[in-house]
Design a protein with these regions (language model features):
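N-terminal glycine-rich flavin-associated loop
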Residues: 21, 46-78, 96, 102-140
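Generic beta-strand/beta-sheet core signal
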Residues: 33, 81, 101-103
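N-terminal accessory segments
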Residues: 1-44, 73-76
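Short hydrophobic/aromatic-rich motifs at helix boundaries and adjacent loops
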Residues: 38-40, 100-103
Length: 140
């Protein structure tokens, strides 16, 4: 799999980026050690592995907005990641991007059986949806 060349200028600013991220979210919600980031070097599609620039695990919508706004202003890429179970490669980390881990946002907000529609936060897994609807004869 051919991935884009990382922006070395962003990588060189990594320490300062992580310091600022720790001002936007609780300090323990920023992961920047190589060892700790190994858990985030792939999604369910593990054929491609890459450590991200940093991992941010926000706890509130306001924290997400603050991180997104600041990264946009600084020209820093963000890779959003739900539960990390995707097999499509849609949440593959990049060396010059902040991985925004949204696994804490794991609530099913609405199930509309008539319209066959579920509204869920990004950390909800397919299995969680299946378990929520299976008693009513549905499967996802």
């Amino acid at each position: 799999m051919l991935m884009p060349e990382p922006d070395q200028g962003v990588i060189d600013r990594r320490d300062g980026i992580c310091r600022t991220l720790r001002q936007l979210v609780p300090a323990d919600c920023v992961i920047d050690s190589r060892e700790s980031m190994r858990a985030y070097d792939a999604d369910g599609l593990s054929a491609y592995r890459q450590l991200p620039l940093a991992v941010v695990l926000p706890e509130t919508v306001e924290q997400i907005a603050a991180v997104m706004k600041w990264c946009h202003q600084q020209g820093i890429k963000i890779v959003p990641r739900g539960a990390g179970t995707s097999l499509s490669g849609g949440a593959l980390p990049l060396a010059d991007a902040v991985l925004l881990g949204l696994g804490k946002f794991n609530r099913i907000l609405e199930i509309d059986y008539d319209n066959r529609c579920v509204v869920a936060q990004p950390g909800v897994t397919n299995l969680a949806i299946t378990k929520a609807v299976e008693a009513d004869g549905f499967y996802y």
